[in-house]
Design a protein with these regions (language model features):
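Asp-box/BNR beta-propeller blade signature and adjacent active/binding-site loops
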Residues: 1-342
Length: 342
């Protein structure tokens, strides 16, 4: 209907009972906490929500909760009623599933990507030394009701790629996945697929302007990309938030540019601080929706007031508003691993 928005989040830092809220006016106001199945209280990681459709045309919403085993809840009535959390297999992962790709030309087929650091992929797995991060893919052929055994996309002890966020190219032929680099040695990374995720390119670094965590993207009506993420860089992690040369280190950030900027490794058009987080990097698992009138609705948590507990805010903005602000905003001087205001 273009107005109803559903939001889930943990009552805690990742682990904790899942809280569920609804907005009936496109994020302007939100309900009180809604009733949830009893075992949603046992969630161990940040929940993720996806809309899916099976090959018969049946719509449903699915919600994942991570660690071992990955569990899933299902709603067949647009979020009014939900099942409890049930395991999807004998495998686990951190923040499952990080992103969902609808397989082109195959109704009801979805590819979900997630990561693990060695601790949760099986019931007997353990973290090794040095720590190895692995990016996985799991395929559903029945509209998200069942999920296949995870396949490894990339695994490394040198760079720790995780928290995938997928973007389809404007012509629909290519998929890009932006990745957090959790060893904090390098910029964020990107991988590409031209066969609907059956295989992927080797990872390569993104521009410093897109470096951070939990990238979530939507196309603006004019064809540009809006990508919301947490700004965290290698140099900032080394020096600390307050000593980082990066203007928006530790803040809720966004990037506007073209898909081809990502392909070319270019910096894009704008880097935006959506909100100033007051405590380290403790912020931002950003959801992003494009409303019917072209408004971006993006929602996440952070420490928005000094000395206060974190809370969740929704921000609404339009591309023309950002363009107007940019005319009177300072420019960035960009190097490969740092940037600062001119």
């Amino acid at each position: 209907d273009g107005k109803t928005v559903l939001c889930v989040y943990p009552k805690g830092h990742g682990r904790g009972p899942i809280v569920y809220k609804r907005s009936n006016d496109a994020g302007k106001t939100w309900s009180n906490r809604l009733p949830t199945p009893d075992n949603w209280s046992s969630s161990k990681e940040v929940p993720t929500l996806f809309q899916v459709t099976d090959k018969e045309g049946n719509d449903r919403i699915i919600m994942f909760s991570g660690l071992y085993p990955i569990r899933m809840a299902v709603s067949n009535d647009e979020g009014k009623n939900w099942t409890g959390l049930k395991p999807i297999g004998e495998f686990g992962g951190i923040v499952a599933m990080g992103t969902m790709i609808s397989v082109k030309g195959k109704p009801g087929h979805y590819r979900a990507l997630f990561h693990d650091d060695g601790r949760f992929i099986s019931n007997k797995s353990k973290r090794t030394s040095p720590t190895r991060f692995t990016l996985y893919s799991s395929l559903s052929v029945d509209g998200g009701m069942t999920w296949g055994k995870p396949e490894t996309i990339y695994s490394s002890t040198r760079i720790h790629l995780c928290e995938p966020g997928s973007i389809r190219s404007p012509d629909g032929k290519q998929i890009a996945v932006l990745l957090r680099e959790n060893s904090r040695r390098e910029n964020s990374y990107v991988i590409f697929s031209e066969n609907e995720g059956a295989s992927w390119t080797e990872p390569r670094e993104l521009s410093i302007t897109l470096t951070g965590d939990r990238h979530t993207a939507k196309y603006l009506p004019d064809g540009r990309l809006f990508i919301s993420f947490r700004c965290r860089t290698a140099i900032g992690s080394k020096l600390g938030v307050s000593n980082s040369p990066i203007p928006y280190e530790g803040d809720w950030a966004a990037w506007i540019g073209k898909y081809q900027n990502i392909v070319n490794g270019d910096p894009g058009q704008y880097v935006i601080r959506i909100a100033d987080n007051k405590k380290g990097w403790d912020t931002t698992y950003p959801a992003v929706e494009l409303l019917e009138d072209g408004t971006i609705l993006t929602t996440t948590y952070g420490h928005w007031q000094e000395g206060e507990q974190p809370y969740i805010i929704s921000v609404r903005l339009k591309a023309n508003e950002i363009d107007q602000l940019a005319q009177k905003s300072p420019k960035l001087r960009i190097n490969s691993d740092t940037m600062h205001l001119k």
